[in-house]
Swiss-Prot record:
An annotated Gene Ontology molecular function: methyltransferase activity
Protein species of origin: Strobilurus tenacellus
GO BP terms: methylation
Record has RNA-binding as a keyword: no
Family: Belongs to the methyltransferase superfamily. LaeA methyltransferase family.
Keyword Transferase: yes
Induction notes from the record: Induced in strobilurin-producing conditions (on CGC medium after 6 days of growth).
Pathway noted in the entry: Mycotoxin biosynthesis
Keyword list, A-Z: Methyltransferase, Transferase
General function of this protein: Methyltransferase; part of the gene cluster that mediates the biosynthesis of strobilurin A, an antifungal polyketide that contains a key beta-methoxyacrylate toxophore that targets the complex III of the mitochondrial electron transport chain. Strobilurin biosynthesis begins with construction of benzoyl CoA by step-wise elimination of ammonia from phenylalanine by the phenylalanine ammonia-lyase str11, oxygenation by str8 and retro-Claisen reaction to form benzoic acid, which is activated to its CoA thiolester benzoyl CoA by the dedicated CoA ligase str10.
EC annotation from Swiss-Prot or TrEMBL: 2.1.1.-
Biotechnological utility: The structure of strobilurin A was used for the development of the major class of beta-methoxyacrylate agricultural fungicides since its beta-methoxyacrylate toxophore targets the Qo site of complex III of the mitochondrial electron transport chain and prevents adenosine triphosphate synthesis. Compounds such as azoxystrobin (Syngenta) and Kresoxim methyl (BASF) are among the most widely used fungicides worldwide. This class of antifungals are used as effective treatments against a broad range of destructive fungal plant pathogens and make significant contributions to food security.
This protein's name: Methyltransferase str2
Domain of life, per lineage: Eukaryota
């Protein structure tokens, strides 16, 4: 659908083996931080689970193993890479900017990670996603705020230019690099939800925090940034991410003698549909 649709879902990185590996590593880092659970809330015994923006398929695989009796549908504009899948996982090619081909209230659990921030008017897509959640079901949303508090980067101009290019490339595709911080007020204003839990996590990219759980997540984000901004292939959507910017960013990220600090913010939302 994505290849034929007039509406293309924006994504500033090319989907290839390197990107699949980066997405796997990111999933593993987040899963470890969450204690290898999908969410702290009790999801009950879901029978139908939807993963929106499946990427490498890592989350769908985890969900299928945790809930072997559930049907797990992974949707994305790009196919899941060839890999062993549990028997209860299936893939469907869907562009989230198009109407969903599903009945309303047809999924017990829906998950979407780091997708809404890339979309034009993510809240309008989120509203359609909420419609798909069954009464009493759960919607799990993970998203980010690439905070533009760059004061701690004055001594790391290469890193500052790289992060600025990341933010501007998302904006150029009508995405919102600060989408995560809009989740809580939007969800709390919805009359369709009976419970709203949003956890904000300040995630230092540098220096690495002493807390072991947070340190692992920070190290994951550093590697993810290096993989994303240093990607050999960039789509035409990438704005300002020239070879010079890439090389400067990678060079400074590899150094241990530089004095700089920067934090982004992750948001983990678990919301329950009114019964």
């Amino acid at each position: 659908m994505a290849a034929e649709s007039a509406k293309q879902t924006p994504y500033v990185l090319v989907a290839d083996e390197v990107e699949w590996a980066r997405l796997d590593a990111m999933h593993n880092g987040i899963a470890k931080f969450l204690g290898n659970e999908l969410t702290p809330v009790d999801l009950g015994q879901p029978k139908k689970i939807l993963e929106i923006g499946a990427g490498s398929g890592a989350w769908a695989i985890q969900a299928a193993k945790l809930y072997p009796d559930a049907d797990v549908l992974a949707i994305d504009m790009n196919p899941i890479p060839a890999r062993p899948l549990p028997p209860n996982v299936r893939y469907q090619n869907i562009n989230v900017l198009e109407p969903f081909p599903f009945e309303a209230a047809s999924f017990d659990v829906i998950h979407i990670r780091l997708v809404l921030c890339h979309l034009p008017d993510g809240h309008s897509v989120l509203k359609r996603i909420i419609d798909l959640v069954a009464p009493g079901g759960w919607l799990l949303i993970d998203d980010i705020d690439w905070a533009e508090a760059f004061e701690g980067l004055d001594k790391a101009p290469g890193i500052k230019r790289g992060l600025t290019a990341l933010v501007r490339s998302m904006e150029a595709e009508a995405g919102d690099p600060h989408y995560g911080k809009t989740l809580k007020p939007y969800l709390e204003a919805s009359k369709e939800l009976s419970e709203v839990h949003v956890r904000e996590v300040e995630l230092p990219v540098n220096p690495i925090p002493e807390d072991p759980a947070l340190a692992g997540l920070s190290q994951m984000m550093r590697k993810a940034l290096v993989g994303a901004l240093g990607a050999a292939k960039q789509s035409s959507a990438t704005v300002g991410l020239t070879k010079e910017v890439q090389e400067g960013f990678l060079s400074e990220m590899a150094r241990e003698d530089m004095d700089w600090s920067y934090s982004c913010y992750l948001y983990f939302a678990a919301v329950k549909k009114s019964a």
